[in-house]
Swiss-Prot record:
Protein name: Cytochrome c oxidase subunit 5A, mitochondrial
GO cellular component: mitochondrial inner membrane; respiratory chain complex IV
Gene that specifies this protein: COX5A
One Pfam family here: COX5A
Known pathway: Energy metabolism; oxidative phosphorylation
Length: 152
């Protein structure tokens, strides 16, 4: 209803700007059939992604064997933009991608981002580190706390 009214106002304003001055002495002509507006519904017909599909999509993204440093950073930047803390399996895949690229700095930065995304919920980051501990040990990645970066 509001959208239709706004479209009519826009068409009337456009017609008024093309036709010249209007007022009591120069009434606006009635809109013809060319000015008729169809009501359009603006929905997204896409399906909604489940949590499992979301996780699988990101794990697949980071598990690409030919991922490069730019794609890794782009993926992490996009992932950080969401209003969530990534699941440990997504972070695991991202850390393994860092290892394939020999990018230790990005691996540590990923862990810093996870801590930052956890925000005031102090129980989330230790849980994620606990879940990732076998991967961190296997890949030789130190946490920011082990490196002393939390004190800087």
């Amino acid at each position: 209803m509001l959208g239709t009214a706004l479209r009519r106002c826009a068409v009337a304003a456009a017609a008024a700007s093309r036709a010249g001055p209007r007022g009591l002495l120069h009434p606006a002509p009635a809109p013809g059939p060319a000015a008729a507006i169809q009501s359009i519904r603006c929905y997204s017909h896409g399906s909604h992604e489940t949590d499992e599909e979301f996780d699988a999509r990101w794990v697949t993204y980071f598990n690409k064997p030919d991922i490069d440093a730019w794609e890794l950073r782009k993926g992490m930047n996009t992932l950080v933009g969401y209003d969530l803390v990534p699941e440990p399996k997504i972070i695991d895949a991202a850390l393994r991608a860092c290892r394939r690229l020999n990018d230790f700095a990005s691996a540590v930065r990923i862990l810093e981002v996870v801590k930052d995304k956890a925000g005031p919920h102090k129980e989330i980051y230790p849980y994620v580190i606990q879940e990732l501990r076998p991967t961190l040990n296997e890949l030789g990645i130190s946490t920011p706390e082990e490196l002393g970066l939390d004190k800087v």
